[in-house]
Amino acid sequence: MLIAYLTAGAPDINTTKEAVMKLAKKGADVIEIGVPYSDALADGAILQKASKQALMNGFHLDHLWNLLSEVNEIEVPLVILAYYNQIWHYGVEKWVKKLVAHNVKGLIVPDLPYEESKTLRQICDRYGLNIIWLISPTTNKTRAQELARACKDWIYVISRTGVTGLETEFDKQIPKLIGELKKVTKAPIALGFGISKSEQVKLVKSWGADGVIIGSACMQILLEKGVDQLSEWISVMKKSFCP
């Protein structure tokens, strides 16, 4: 399973639309779309740059809703990443209903602890939207298992502590963590943060992961080389995971 990340509106919303359509045809199994945010604590330099560019170009939520309407017919599931402050200001139930109406399958909220998510969980359950929880190498075993059981779609395992980026060193506990999660859930496990090379994809697969999430590398290629180069590169990365 290859999950490709795009920042909505970077470098512009039409390019995002084109990228979604082409990645869906070139091997992405899931496309994660990040909502630009000025205080995205989990973002490294590349994704911060992408968010800043989108916001400077005047991105607002109407652009997101229009984008989702225009790519609604693709067969690849869409997942939205947004920070809770964005969701809260828009209105939690209104936000969830909007995503479901646009055929979005999952929601990632990186700054919302599970213990503080009761309202969002209840609303998502009501409308059939999956929350995808993040599990890191520093998450204690009991909490990791609780989060794994709460995931109804796939599980996002962070390869190391810190922010997103192209840094390639994975935490040494990752293989063990994947094994422990496999004991308590049948949900697919995808590894993200720092994945940008075919060799890494093959290594992650050898650890038992069911997928990889590629964000910073996708946005770097998109911003520097364009949609066609990104879609061809994704095709190569997909073949590394599924030869």
Swiss-Prot record:
Stretch forming the signal peptide: none
GO molecular function terms listed in the Swiss-Prot or TrEMBL record: tryptophan synthase activity
A GO CC term assigned to this protein in UniProt: chloroplast
Localization (cell): Plastid, Chloroplast
Reactions accelerated catalytically: (1S,2R)-1-C-(indol-3-yl)glycerol 3-phosphate + L-serine = D-glyceraldehyde 3-phosphate + L-tryptophan + H2O
Superkingdom in the source lineage: Eukaryota
UniProt keyword terms in alphabetical order: Amino-acid biosynthesis, Aromatic amino acid biosynthesis, Chloroplast, Lyase, Plastid, Tryptophan biosynthesis
Active-site residue numbers: E32, D43
Pathway: Amino-acid biosynthesis; L-tryptophan biosynthesis; L-tryptophan from chorismate: step 5/5
Keyword Iron: no
Keyword check for Lyase: yes
Function: The alpha subunit is responsible for the aldol cleavage of indoleglycerol phosphate to indole and glyceraldehyde 3-phosphate.
Protein name per UniProt: Tryptophan synthase alpha chain
